[in-house]
Amino acid sequence: MAPKAEKKPAAKKPAEEEPAAEKAEKTPAGKKPKAEKRLPAGKSAAKEGGDKKGKKKAKKSVETYKIYIFKVLKQVHPDIGISSKAMSIMNSFINDIFEKLAGEAAKLARYNKKPTITSREIQTSVRLVLPGELAKHAVSEGTKAVTKFTSS
């Protein structure tokens, strides 16, 4: 058997020769190292740094009912404004109601084994989802809107 080579302990480098990366990793006992800024997957430092050569990311369009809420508000009360928080609440309210109506209309179409949601399913779902007098007004306004749309 060949004799094993003796392992000599690695000589300690002087402090000034120690790379900056190693210094950053060493932290005092008991403290967590600071989190480094990480880029999302698929993004390079050149794009993040404001390099003009990279492609601009297209803005995702977000559809809201804010302009329509504002138009209705001005029809009903021309002298009253609305705060952005109240507008956001109204937008969420309309999204919730439409989601309930669409879900109910989908159920009705499924029950009747129809592949299509028609104005009849929407009208029935309005009667089921909205209470009493509100449902009557909604049905009459909806019928009026559909008639106006089909006549033009």
Curated annotation (Swiss-Prot):
The keyword Ubl conjugation applies. Residues 1-28 have a biased composition (Basic and acidic residues). It is found in: Nucleus; Chromosome. GO terms for cellular component: nucleosome; nucleus. It holds the Pfam family Histone. PROSITE patterns: HISTONE_H2B. The modification N6-acetyllysine is found at residues 7, 37. One of its GO terms (molecular function) is protein heterodimerization activity. InterPro entries: Histone-fold, Histone_H2A/H2B/H3, Histone_H2B, HISTONE_H2B_site. Its main location: nucleus. Core component of nucleosome. Nucleosomes wrap and compact DNA into chromatin, limiting DNA accessibility to the cellular machineries which require DNA as a template. Histones thereby play a central role in transcription regulation, DNA repair, DNA replication and chromosomal stability. DNA accessibility is regulated via a complex set of post-translational modifications of histones, also called histone code, and nucleosome remodeling. Belongs to the histone H2B family. This is Histone H2B.1. It comes from Triticum aestivum (Wheat). The lineage of its organism: Eukaryota, Viridiplantae, Streptophyta, Embryophyta, Tracheophyta.
